[in-house]
């Protein structure tokens, strides 16, 4: 214990963030033992008044005593870290689950809570959690369970979205007026639908689409009832011009 590097010894002047990083890497018991040893070694030394130094060490030890190790059902990032994108997530989940993902619940590694899709062997062991440096080193090698559990959720979400019909689309567009980015996406969809309509029906005279994403984000307009000012929709005999943000769609119609 006394041969530990200098960076592994608790320092009451380093702040709470440094103490929590040390607790994440070394564990509560080891940090408290080292704090008591260092506190005993420097009693009566240093430029600080003894009462102030004692108060700092006591605050450090109380913080360490109240710390609890983070316990998560699974580790890892998300499905994209493993290269799973889009609908391929649903295709990759079932064969991987059937292949035996319980290997991810190995002792000393990633553990799964009982009742999870991957099975489980109970809560983690008493081994201290990995340090943040180790987690950054392992970020490009996520565990199978940590990657495929969120992938399962993404696949279920895709399936529900694909099988929900128009109701899901209507609910999604109901909140577009609160999200400028969603309005821009709706305008892009509007332009694509109008382009497909012009190829199928002859009463569509033309389509002019010009968009700059910054201007579209700033100029997304709602219906006339939602704004105080001049309307953006103009209806003329024989044709209809609809302006919305950066898009202008011209239709022919009855007078």
From Swiss-Prot:
Residues 112-145, 157-183 are annotated as: Disordered. It comes from the Bacteria. This is Uncharacterized 28 kDa protein in petA 5'region. It comes from Rhodospirillum rubrum.
